[in-house]
């Protein structure tokens, strides 16, 4: 039991530390019609080089996720995954020109008691997205009406424009972290429209993370909680 509790605590490092365990999607940012496109799901801390093992202690606790490919016309296709050493692997074949949005949702994570850290008792809700461009650019789709989501807006390729939505509405003045490898990070805040923009100084992978608390108590799997901690990530990979 003590071992299980210690592992559960890994899920919520963001509430106590600048570092954060989170789920994120990795995939190439461009695709081609009729060609299989791979998608990876990771759990850990990208900027610290932490990639949890699929069969380790931490990843199984957040592995009840669903994964979808949303086509430019809005068609949603569920994606099955295969467990690898440090990620889950999925694949699909684009059949339309435009922007494909890959979405991951996990609202099935056990309640955690952090009263000893003066944080409370809460439930975690993860949501992740990634963009695949097949020809014509545009906005990514959103598919998380019950939580927080990061939406990429159409851009010129030099400056990334994002919008953070909570239950379908823009969330203003919300903190957003941008990570790359080797411990580099940048903190930004959304404007009144929930939007934020930033340049990409390096040709590398970027992980964006933002969180919010839903101060409504409830019960999950027989355990009461005081609030829901929502975490959204977005992967930018050239």
Model-predicted segments: where are they?
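Sec/Tat signal peptide C-region and signal peptidase I cleavage site
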Residues: 15-20
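Sec-dependent N-terminal signal peptides
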Residues: 4-14
């Amino acid at each position: 039991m003590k071992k299980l509790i210690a592992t559960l605590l890994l899920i919520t490092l963001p509430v106590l530390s600048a570092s954060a365990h989170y789920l994120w999607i990795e995939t190439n940012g461009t695709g081609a019609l009729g060609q299989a496109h791979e998608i990876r799901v990771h759990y850990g801390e990208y900027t610290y080089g932490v990639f949890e093992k699929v069969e380790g202690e931490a990843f199984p606790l957040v592995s009840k996720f669903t994964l979808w490919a949303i086509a430019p016309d809005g068609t949603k296709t569920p994606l099955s995954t295969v467990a690898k050493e440090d990620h889950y692997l999925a694949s699909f074949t684009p059949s339309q020109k435009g922007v494909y949005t890959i979405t991951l949702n996990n609202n099935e994570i056990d309640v955690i008691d952090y009263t000893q850290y003066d944080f409370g008792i809460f439930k975690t809700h993860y949501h992740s997205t990634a963009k695949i461009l097949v020809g014509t650019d545009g906005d990514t789709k959103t598919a998380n009406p019950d939580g927080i989501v990061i939406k990429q807006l159409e851009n010129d390729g030099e400056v990334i424009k994002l919008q953070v939505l909570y239950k379908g509405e823009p969330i203003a003045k919300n903190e957003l972290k941008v990570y790359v490898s080797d411990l580099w990070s940048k903190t930004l805040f959304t404007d009144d429209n929930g939007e934020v923009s930033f340049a990409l100084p390096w040709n590398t992978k970027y992980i964006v993370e933002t969180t919010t608390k839903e101060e409504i108590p409830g019960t999950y799997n027989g355990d009461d909680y005081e609030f829901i901690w929502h975490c959204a990530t977005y992967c930018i990979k050239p």
